């Protein structure tokens, strides 16, 4: 059984979304995922971190942090994105396609739908005034590393 874990925390700024996406992808690369699997993971990290930055705190809130942790076990990847922002009043409503608390923004309201499409499991816990935890799990195909026998 292969098991590994990493955690990072950064200021809630949209510029840090790319850092989180790349760091998680680099960590998961040790499992030798397919390009599609890696793209799915990068996409959901981008969506979850962007949601935390925009909705939890407002853009680039000094002292407000987003935490991303990743745990791999065998071929399963578990990603958790946590903020201590405003929280979500109605999680089920927020998970509905096209629902957004920011209707003035083009392309808003698809974050949770995208996460649910690319991951095997998505759980959201939120308490208004205390923050939100998004936990996502994806089972990767078996490692493609094949021994060459002469």
UniProtKB/Swiss-Prot annotation:
Gene3D superfamilies: Histidine kinase-like ATPase, C-terminal domain. Belongs to the anti-sigma-factor family. It comes from the Bacteria. InterPro entries: Anti-sigma-factor_SerPK, Anti-sigma_F, HATPase_C_sf. Keywords: ATP-binding, Kinase, Nucleotide-binding, Serine/threonine-protein kinase, Sporulation, Transferase. The keyword Nuclease does not apply. NCBIfam families: spIIAB. PANTHER family: ANTI-SIGMA-F FACTOR RSBW (PTHR35526:SF3), ANTI-SIGMA-F FACTOR RSBW-RELATED (PTHR35526). This is Anti-sigma F factor. GO terms for biological process: asexual sporulation; negative regulation of sporulation resulting in formation of a cellular spore; sporulation resulting in formation of a cellular spore. It comes from Pasteuria penetrans. GO terms for molecular function: ATP binding; protein serine kinase activity; protein serine/threonine kinase activity; sigma factor antagonist activity. It catalyses: L-seryl-[protein] + ATP = O-phospho-L-seryl-[protein] + ADP + H(+); L-threonyl-[protein] + ATP = O-phospho-L-threonyl-[protein] + ADP + H(+). The gene is spoIIAB. Transmembrane segments: none annotated. Binds to sigma F and blocks its ability to form an RNA polymerase holoenzyme (E-sigma F). Phosphorylates SpoIIAA on a serine residue. This phosphorylation may enable SpoIIAA to act as an anti-anti-sigma factor that counteracts SpoIIAB and thus releases sigma F from inhibition. Its EC number is 2.7.11.1.
